[in-house]
Amino acid sequence: MSDMIRVTLPDGSAREVARGTTPAEIAAAIGPGLAKAALAAKIDGELRDIMRPLEEDTNLALVTSRDEADALELARHDYAHVLAEAVQTLFPGTQITFGPATSDGFYYDFAPTAEHGPFRDEELPLIEEEMRRIIAADKPLRREVWDRDALIARWKKDGETFKAEWAAELPAGEEISVYWSGDDWMDMCRGPHLASTGKLDPAAFKLTRVSGAYWRGDQKNAQLSRIYGTGWLNRKQLAEHLVRLEEAAKRDHRRLGQEMDLFHLQQEAHGSVFWHPNGFVVWRELEAYMRRAIDAAGYREVKTPQVMDARQWEQSGHWGKYRENMFVIPDEVPNTEDEGPIVSDDAEWMALKPMNCPAHVLIFRQGMKSYRDLPLRLYENGCCHRNEPHGALHGLMRVRQFTQDDAHIFCREDQIVEEVRNFCALADRIYKDFGFTYAIKLALRPEKRFGSDAMWDKSEDELRNAVIEAGLATEQYGWEELPGEGAFYAPKLEWHLTDAIGRTWQVGTIQSDRVLPDRLDASYIGEDGERHRPVMLHRAIFGSYERFIGILIEHFVGRFPTWLAPVQAVVATIVSDADDYAKAATARLVAAGIRTESDLRNEKINYKVREHSLAKVPHLLVVGKREAEEGTVAIRTLGQDGQRIMPLAEAIAMLKTQATPPDLKVR
């Protein structure tokens, strides 16, 4: 074996270097500026430590802070390790478990000592101070490879039972990498890491909160303390992020949902939503809007059972792939005379549906279908249940019971591209009605999947070609292909909405599926008189009503457009002499189809204005003695200064226009 290897750089130039040379040494040979700026290396596209020796011919790219995505991933990973070291320094006996980088920071899960108990938010400044001390010490971050059994013994000796358990599940004889911070602290980690803690900016991170978590996300396991932080490359990025967090807090749908009396959640129905009258108005408006859209697009609405036999889920493939996220119950009447229900060993099992697709196939299979019957578009506002971990639940954004605007299009091979293109046009119109821009992504085959490579090639090409024909595969629409992100049965197109403060939310999807029709034996009679499998297009636009409403609340800061607002107008009196006129005005507004309430309380008008503004009522119609005599109203519109005086009839006409859903307006 030669002592020299060939290293090819991004510009195409190549260098012969000694085997064992590090990327850091190559950076230094190129120039002192690059040596200082280089943070890590990409070896044949894979992110690696800059101090890790090169052992074979390779393509090398040096990562600097200009490569922001890679640099942020490295920095956040390192902040997580520095956090763990700081906690163990300050609180001896605390066990470390797991701590990854996240989309805007990092977290680490700890098992505190029984004497200390769970960590508290007020301890975060102390931990931050210790983290800055570790960063200032510029401790080298050194990779070391251990034998699995030796590492398990080391973790047990150090009292790190969680790490020992994790290591014990790795294959016997496997070498495991650990990273040392200096010579006095280590963690088990695949890496990569920066060369030293001093590469981090001590003013570019902040610990944000503490929460509970469970070992491996399972509530049956030990409860842990999770410390969250946000980490960036410099203090300017951190400051900008904190401003975004402050703005996001103002828009938090959980707080606004309470203030506007839209919904609530409670432990007795963990992960399920109690919709209040105001919130359910929003729900019903969205439901009516979507029904009009799908009716016009040629869909037929159906309703399917909540509970189905486990054998159906086994046949569809969901039981093997999705069982741990399903709510399962025995198909047997419990023996109520005993202390608790008894389930026999041979009991049959039922499951609450986590998705609607198998049931729609069963509808398709009822009665013989001809090629002339296709495409058949079945739509359902389908209520589903998924057993999400407690720690993953988040307001309306992540729930256990949710309703999808779900549809499945059964079509022939020659109809796929047109159906996908039509769906793209439908989704575009709907998202624009709500004021959203979006990016569209193609999620490609995952490592674990059903079906042949040829089938996946065909399905991916069909989705790709439909987007190209629709003119959406462009930079304007954020077109991107995402390897490994598809469902286990099909590739999918994803719609990522951008809200008022620049955050993105993945909502709509369409998937081209040849697996499920085959597994559930769906067929139609072709023009040739033979049986053929339909292709099944799974699609949704809102995703789920719960999550979409949460997104709308935050996007509009609770200030829904008039057509969606639970209460569209309030008629408020200045003096009691105007009470009768206010009642009559309210009645006329209600008769015109405007959701209106009257406020006749003996309160100052400024108090009423403030209260209804906080409730996000879009229009306040103020009436006093003069308005009653002249048949006028003084209209105040939420978010605008001043007021307009106009005849009541004119005000009703204006509000009727604003209360008209966008799809019912002349386009």
Curated annotation (Swiss-Prot):
<dbReference type="InterPro" id="IPR036621">
    <property type="entry name" value="Anticodon-bd_dom_sf"/>
</dbReference>
<keyword id="KW-0030">Aminoacyl-tRNA synthetase</keyword>
<dbReference type="InterPro" id="IPR018163">
    <property type="entry name" value="Thr/Ala-tRNA-synth_IIc_edit"/>
</dbReference>
<keyword id="KW-0067">ATP-binding</keyword>
<keyword id="KW-0479">Metal-binding</keyword>
<dbReference type="InterPro" id="IPR002320">
    <property type="entry name" value="Thr-tRNA-ligase_IIa"/>
</dbReference>
<dbReference type="InterPro" id="IPR012676">
    <property type="entry name" value="TGS-like"/>
</dbReference>
<dbReference type="InterPro" id="IPR004154">
    <property type="entry name" value="Anticodon-bd"/>
</dbReference>
<keyword id="KW-0648">Protein biosynthesis</keyword>
<comment type="function">
    <text>Catalyzes the attachment of threonine to tRNA(Thr) in a two-step reaction: L-threonine is first activated by ATP to form Thr-AMP and then transferred to the acceptor end of tRNA(Thr). Also edits incorrectly charged L-seryl-tRNA(Thr).</text>
</comment>
<keyword id="KW-0963">Cytoplasm</keyword>
<dbReference type="GO" id="GO:0046872">
    <property type="term" value="F:metal ion binding"/>
</dbReference>
<dbReference type="InterPro" id="IPR012675">
    <property type="entry name" value="Beta-grasp_dom_sf"/>
</dbReference>
<dbReference type="InterPro" id="IPR033728">
    <property type="entry name" value="ThrRS_core"/>
</dbReference>
<dbReference type="GO" id="GO:0005829">
    <property type="term" value="C:cytosol"/>
</dbReference>
<feature type="binding site">
    <location>
        <position position="357"/>
    </location>
    <ligand>
        <name>Zn(2+)</name>
    </ligand>
</feature>
<dbReference type="GO" id="GO:0005524">
    <property type="term" value="F:ATP binding"/>
</dbReference>
<keyword id="KW-0436">Ligase</keyword>
<dbReference type="InterPro" id="IPR012947">
    <property type="entry name" value="tRNA_SAD"/>
</dbReference>
<dbReference type="InterPro" id="IPR045864">
    <property type="entry name" value="aa-tRNA-synth_II/BPL/LPL"/>
</dbReference>
<dbReference type="GO" id="GO:0000049">
    <property type="term" value="F:tRNA binding"/>
</dbReference>
<feature type="region of interest" description="Catalytic">
    <location>
        <begin position="252"/>
        <end position="561"/>
    </location>
</feature>
<feature type="binding site">
    <location>
        <position position="538"/>
    </location>
    <ligand>
        <name>Zn(2+)</name>
    </ligand>
</feature>
<dbReference type="Pfam" id="PF03129">
    <property type="entry name" value="HGTP_anticodon"/>
</dbReference>
<dbReference type="InterPro" id="IPR004095">
    <property type="entry name" value="TGS"/>
</dbReference>
<feature type="domain" description="TGS">
    <location>
        <begin position="3"/>
        <end position="64"/>
    </location>
</feature>
<dbReference type="InterPro" id="IPR002314">
    <property type="entry name" value="aa-tRNA-synt_IIb"/>
</dbReference>
<comment type="subunit">
    <text>Homodimer.</text>
</comment>
<keyword id="KW-0862">Zinc</keyword>
<comment type="similarity">
    <text>Belongs to the class-II aminoacyl-tRNA synthetase family.</text>
</comment>
<dbReference type="GO" id="GO:0004829">
    <property type="term" value="F:threonine-tRNA ligase activity"/>
</dbReference>
<dbReference type="Pfam" id="PF07973">
    <property type="entry name" value="tRNA_SAD"/>
</dbReference>
<dbReference type="GO" id="GO:0006435">
    <property type="term" value="P:threonyl-tRNA aminoacylation"/>
</dbReference>
<keyword id="KW-0820">tRNA-binding</keyword>
<dbReference type="Pfam" id="PF00587">
    <property type="entry name" value="tRNA-synt_2b"/>
</dbReference>
<keyword id="KW-0547">Nucleotide-binding</keyword>
<dbReference type="Pfam" id="PF02824">
    <property type="entry name" value="TGS"/>
</dbReference>
<protein>
    <recommendedName>
        <fullName>Threonine--tRNA ligase</fullName>
        <ecNumber>6.1.1.3</ecNumber>
    </recommendedName>
</protein>
<keyword id="KW-0694">RNA-binding</keyword>
<feature type="binding site">
    <location>
        <position position="408"/>
    </location>
    <ligand>
        <name>Zn(2+)</name>
    </ligand>
</feature>
<dbReference type="InterPro" id="IPR047246">
    <property type="entry name" value="ThrRS_anticodon"/>
</dbReference>
<dbReference type="InterPro" id="IPR006195">
    <property type="entry name" value="aa-tRNA-synth_II"/>
</dbReference>
